[in-house]
């Protein structure tokens, strides 16, 4: 079984679902998502631990004239993210299958296309192929927002497209420049295969401006402040299943891109821009935290909490330390497992508050739906990184890596952890406790909500007990990924010592 089967299976299932009678389309797509999940589990089960290189490699020439390969592979950076993708898409499709959608064939087709694009981006081992899948992700979400969104969906779609296309333009320019400059440097033929590009060290000035091109694209997609101008309208207008997978896994493709592409290909630039990136992360952490704490819109609390959490993840990546990088990878998974059920819970609470997502219309749900409130409490505690949760381990590792790199930055970031506890508890207490809301109906958790939320909550609990599931698989590859940047940083410190300038030395593990 090859990775191509895993990548294109969701799209194939969505096309088969379109042939079904209309009442069966959603259930067929949902059951099909379990097949994709099973295939992903089979790859994870066969994944060899302690191996830093690629596994399950597919490598075929795609466009020979441009040196573009259809190269796929799994390693410690992407194997758990692939599994996360299939879990969250499956949960979202089951949530969707219990609802009526206009033009259901088109709706489930775009969901299948989105899952295939995300899986392709995670598995791509050719820079041009990664860019193709990265841009392909925009198409289904353009239609999911524009055709099935709510509120100001036209405005939301326009902003999403403009921001994403600008980011994609920068990424395309950076990718082309990387391939061309690498070819000029070696005097060989043009290639975009990542393993080949990593063998060549571009000039410092070239690395700097190409780094900025990729950084803009990834920071817009995640997004981090101040690149988040599309987020409020986009997240507010997306249908709940779409926003759950967008925040849960699509945003992770951008964070993953920093690890897969930026750090190994541009080590000098990664060190050169380390401090600006860390400062940007701090600004974004506090911006997301403050907005999440002050807004009365439950969906926006989750949206801006995602900005803060993704900023923590980026902080760990640019600590350029193994602990920070592993914490970032672990929290990519943790955040996906937390944010998707949070959006489902917001939708469930809104149904019980007369369709309103305003926190002022909620309250008292815990007294009438204690099981639903229990699920919400587990997710909220995971969000605030309660000791004992997998999120706590991830954030601890991020802060440890940041402390090893820049102590002052880690102290300021730690205060952001306290802010996360404040907005997570505020969301839970206001929506599920306090007074009884104006329109709260007496309804316990239903099958529609249970099939999407309960399995993810169980995974959260399993990872809390056994976080090594992800850590053991990622460690060898992660260390190899950040090694070029660490070597560059060490060379910079040596140069400063040779010049007689003081250098702050921090122990690294």
Q: Which stretches of residues belong to each language-model region?
A:
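Structural signature of hydrophobic alpha-helical transmembrane segments
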Residues: 1-9, 74-85, 128-140, 207-220, ...
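Juxtamembrane/interfacial segments at transmembrane-helix boundaries in multi-pass membrane proteins
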Residues: 48-69, 169-228, 233, 258-276, ...
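Alpha-helical transmembrane segments of multipass membrane proteins
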Residues: 14-19, 41, 90-94, 116-120, ...
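Transmembrane helix-loop-helix hairpins at membrane boundaries of multipass inner-membrane proteins
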Residues: 2, 17-109, 184-199, 480, ...
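Central hydrophobic cores of alpha-helical transmembrane segments in multi-pass inner-membrane proteins
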Residues: 2-19, 30-45, 82-96, 114-116, ...
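Membrane-interfacial loop-to-helix junctions in multi-pass inner-membrane proteins
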Residues: 19-36, 99-113, 128-131, 149-170, ...
């Amino acid at each position: 079984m090859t990775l191509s089967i895993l990548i294109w299976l969701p799209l194939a299932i969505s096309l088969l679902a379109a042939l079904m009678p209309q009442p069966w389309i959603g259930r067929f797509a949902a059951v099909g998502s379990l097949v994709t999940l099973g295939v992903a589990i089979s790859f994870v089960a066969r994944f060899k631990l302690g191996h830093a290189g690629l596994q399950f490699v597919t490598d075929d020439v795609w466009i020979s004239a441009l040196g573009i390969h259809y190269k796929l592979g799994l390693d410690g950076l992407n194997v758990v993210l692939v599994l996360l993708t299939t879990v969250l898409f499956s949960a979202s499709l089951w949530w969707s299958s219990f609802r009526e959608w206009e033009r259901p064939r088109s709706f489930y087709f775009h969901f299948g296309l989105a899952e295939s694009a995300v899986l392709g981006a995670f598995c791509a081992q050719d820079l041009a192929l990664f860019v193709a899948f990265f841009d392909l992700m925009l198409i289904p979400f353009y239609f999911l927002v524009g055709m099935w969104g709510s509120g100001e969906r036209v405005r939301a779609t326009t902003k999403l497209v403009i921001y994403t296309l600008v980011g994609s333009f920068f990424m395309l320019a950076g990718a082309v420049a990387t391939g061309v400059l690498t070819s000029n440097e070696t005097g060989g033929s043009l290639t975009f295969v990542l393993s080949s590009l990593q063998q060549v060290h571009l000039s410092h000035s070239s690395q700097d401006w190409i780094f900025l091109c990729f950084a803009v694209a990834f920071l817009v997609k995640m997004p981090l402040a101040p690149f988040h101008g599309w987020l409020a309208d986009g997240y507010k207008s997306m249908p709940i299943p779409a926003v759950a997978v967008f925040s849960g896994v699509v945003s992770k493709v951008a964070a993953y891109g920093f690890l897969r592409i930026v750090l190994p290909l541009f080590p000098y630039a990664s060190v050169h821009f380390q401090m600006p990136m860390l400062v940007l992360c701090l600004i974004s952490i506090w911006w997301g935290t403050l907005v999440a704490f002050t807004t009365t819109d439950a969906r926006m609390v989750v949206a801006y909490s995602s900005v803060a959490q993704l900023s923590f993840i980026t902080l760990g990546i640019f600590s350029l330390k193994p602990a920070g990088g592993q914490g970032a990878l672990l929290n990519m998974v943790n955040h996906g497992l937390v944010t998707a059920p949070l959006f489902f819970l917001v939708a469930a609470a809104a149904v019980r508050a007369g369709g309103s997502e305003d926190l002022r219309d909620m309250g008292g749900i815990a007294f009438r739906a204690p099981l639903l409130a229990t699920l919400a409490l587990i997710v909220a505690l995971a969000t605030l990184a309660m000791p004992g949760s997998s999120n706590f381990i991830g954030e601890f590792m991020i802060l440890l890596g940041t402390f090893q790199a820049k102590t002052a930055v880690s102290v300021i970031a730690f205060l952001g952890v306290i802010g996360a506890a404040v907005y997570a508890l505020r969301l839970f207490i206001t929506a599920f406790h306090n007074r009884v809301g104006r329109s709260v109906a007496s309804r316990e958790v239903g099958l529609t909500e249970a099939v999407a939320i309960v399995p993810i909550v169980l995974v959260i609990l399993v990872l809390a007990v056994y976080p090594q599931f992800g850590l053991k698989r990622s460690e060898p590859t992660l260390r190899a990924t950040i090694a070029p940047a660490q070597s560059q940083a060490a060379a910079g410190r040596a140069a400063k010592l040779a010049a007689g300038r003081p250098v702050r030395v921090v122990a690294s593990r």
